[in-house]
């Protein structure tokens, strides 16, 4: 029997559909690029906190539909089924359905507007090991080396999505920023 959406599914996913936060789990070529970028950031004095590297399809499914339903971007009945995830998105009432989905969004710590304006993808680069969610922080100006050795001065900005200089440094290492999702970097910027 299906279990209604809600915080149960966060606990379930933490056992049955875990994320990784280890760089070692990334695709080998992207892993090298990420290591080099993070080393450059740390050598310049930045702190880097990694929240996610790889993600299972089941977790991506739960992220996607809980976000869309909680934000009113679709009806619970729009959610497709996924083998191995016996969830009931429709609580028989749209407000209860949205509340159950929102419990999941909060439990998973998903970015919602204005931090992220798009739902987590069903076919995320995280599934392929080609994306990383990380927070980069520092105070003042950061003098960081691009891959070619050029030093770039990057001023701290609270809104990382708008910090184009930081994005340029990452891109020089093959780590591209998705500008609509604060922590997300990948091999292709998606």
Predicted segments with their positions:
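Cell-envelope/glycan interface and biosynthesis
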Residues: 2-179, 186-190
């Amino acid at each position: 029997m299906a279990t209604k959406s809600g915080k149960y599914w966060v606990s379930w996913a933490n056992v049955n559909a875990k994320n990784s936060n280890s760089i070692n789990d990334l695709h080998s070529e992207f892993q090298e690029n990420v290591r080099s970028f993070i080393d450059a950031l740390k050598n310049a004095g930045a702190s880097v906190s990694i929240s996610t590297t790889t993600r299972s399809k089941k977790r991506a499914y739960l992220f996607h539909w809980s976000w869309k339903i909680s934000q009113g971007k679709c009806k619970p009945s729009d959610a497709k089924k996924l083998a191995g995830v016996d969830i009931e998105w429709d609580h028989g009432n749209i407000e209860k359905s949205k509340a159950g989905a929102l419990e999941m969004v909060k439990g998973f710590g998903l970015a919602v507007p204005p931090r992220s304006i798009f739902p987590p993808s069903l076919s995320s680069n995280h599934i392929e090991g080609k994306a990383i969610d990380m927070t980069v922080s520092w105070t003042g100006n950061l003098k960081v080396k691009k891959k070619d050795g050029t030093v770039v001065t990057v001023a701290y900005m609270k809104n990382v999505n708008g910090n184009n200089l930081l994005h340029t440094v990452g891109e020089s290492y093959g780590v591209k920023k998705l500008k609509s999702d604060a922590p997300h970097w990948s091999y292709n910027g998606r």
